[in-house]
Amino acid sequence: MNATSQHPFALPYPIVENRLVVGGIPITRLAERVGQTPFYAYDRRLISERVALLRSALPSDIHLHFAVKSNPMPAVVQFMAGLVDGFDVASGGELKTVLDTAMPPEQISFAGPGKSGRELRQSVAAGIVVNVESEREVTLLAEAGASLGLIPKVAVRVNPDFELKSSGMKMGGGPKQFGVDAEQVPDLLTRIKALGLDFTAKCR
């Protein structure tokens, strides 16, 4: 019997003879091939189709970046490197994973509050863009750059003074843990310029 899962959130994997089929291979055979259960299985064709569908709905000058925290599995990240225009990471571990791909460092960005001094130094050495979220991070990046003989690449993650009412996620509108409050941005940009950091402006 052939069937397709009707679960509203399930990927369209077929079911053949009561066995889920992923990438044309029955799940039972995949388990034998992996050698253990549980395990994760992904269909490269479906991933490619989803990315292509998203691109078709967006203007051609929009760049797609994959948030690695959504799925940091190395095999998935390696595959995504050939489909998207860049990576966004949120930890030193994620950065290490993406640096093992063919993605150019300038297309990798590091965002998230509470970055450690070691992670910031790692970022400068790798030549990626760091989305700074505090004056502390700017200072640590400048120190790392001076020590390594490199110019840190930075952007500023701005916490705007307004809130999107239709969004379920509230990452703007008054003080938040994410980003620099809008009223503090001019002073921070002045400091970035004074320290000689390589600033880039982006819209995400």
Indicate residue ranges for each PLM-predicted region.
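Residue-level recognition of the N-termini of beta-strands and the immediately preceding loop/turn
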Residues: 62, 152-154, 199-203
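A charged N-terminal "starter" segment
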Residues: 1-146, 150-152
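Glycine-rich, aromatic-flanked loop segments that form ligand/cofactor-binding clefts
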Residues: 151-163
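Active-site loop/helix belt of alpha/beta enzymes
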Residues: 1-3, 8, 160-204
